[in-house]
From Swiss-Prot:
Any one biological process term the GO annotation gives: positive regulation of transcription by RNA polymerase II
Record GO cellular component, one term: nucleus
Residue intervals of the K-box domain: 103-193
Location(s) in or outside the cell: Nucleus
Function: Probable transcription factor involved in regulating genes that determines stamen and carpel development in wild-type flowers.
Molecular function, one GO term: protein dimerization activity
Organism: Panax ginseng
Gene assigned in the entry: AG2
Main location: nucleus
SUPFAM superfamilies cross-referenced by the UniProt entry: SRF-like
Protein name, UniProt field: Floral homeotic protein AGAMOUS
Keyword entries, A-Z: Activator, DNA-binding, Nucleus, Transcription, Transcription regulation
């Protein structure tokens, strides 16, 4: 019986395929990972079936997908094969050796992970300009190239954000200017309407308008237009004496 979990499947670091060597590691793209899972799962089920038929072996296969969906195959019964496996492990005198082998395997995996972590930390220190003593001229040139590319991408992204911010502020300035012009036009329109209302007859402002101030020139000018009653009386007196 074989157990295979796509989340923690343990395979050799590399597998020889017809078109060359590929690195066996987790597929980051979700769609590609799902497609590969379906293909490999079907192939695994087919191999289990062929093994049970060709070799007359009792085979039970259990696969859990990333989403927790169960896929299984057994030429007899999965539960029966599992019970047989448990009984064989209990009765086997090599139970301790199996546990030791499992412990050794996990120790090796932990050691690999520690090495990967150490390598990543070293690369990070090199990127910061630290721990450069062990690097060769070729390594330093490669590191310099990586840093230049990284700085170029960072500057490009920074300029992109700055241009977007400038464009946004310019648009905001135009909007504020348009709003200011609109408000000025509305204020001028309201003032003209108010002046027009004040000049209309019958309005309270028109009736309560203050009288014009006294002007002597206007008074003399108005008297000059009136008939001279003094000379008129003298003429009348002369007519009466004759």
């Amino acid at each position: 019986m074989s157990f295979y979990d796509d989340q923690s499947g343990n395979l050799s670091p590399q597998r020889k395929l017809g078109r060359g060597k590929i690195e066996i590691k987790r597929i980051e793209n979700t769609t590609n990972r799902q497609v590969t899972f379906c293909k490999r799962r079907n192939g695994l089920l087919k191999k289990a079936y062929e093994l049970s038929v060709l070799c007359d072996a009792e085979v039970a296969l259990i696969v859990f997908s990333t989403r927790g969906r169960l896929y299984e195959y057994a030429n007899n019964s999965v539960k029966g094969t599992i019970e047989r496996y448990k009984k064989a492990c209990t009765d086997s005198p090599n139970t301790s050796s199996v546990s030791e082998a499992n412990a050794q395997f996990y120790q090796q995996e932990a050691s690999k992970l520690r090495q990967e972590i150490s390598s990543i930390q070293k690369n990070n220190r090199n990127m910061m300009g630290e721990s450069l003593g062990s690097l060769t001229v070729r390594d330093l040139k490669g590191l310099e190239t990586k840093l230049e590319k990284g700085i170029s991408r960072i500057r490009s992204k920074k300029n992109e954000l700055l241009f977007a911010e400038i464009e946004y502020m310019q648009k905001k300035e135009i909007d504020l200017h348009n709003n200011n012009q609109y408000l000025r036009a509305k204020i001028a329109e309201n003032e003209r309407a108010q002046q027009h209302m004040n000049l209309m007859p019958g309005s309270s402002d028109y009736e309560l308008a203050p009288p014009q101030s006294f002007d002597g020139r206007n008074y003399i000018q108005l008297n000059g237009l009136q008939p001279n009653n003094h000379y008129s009386r003298q003429d009348q007196t002369a007519l009466q004496l004759v």
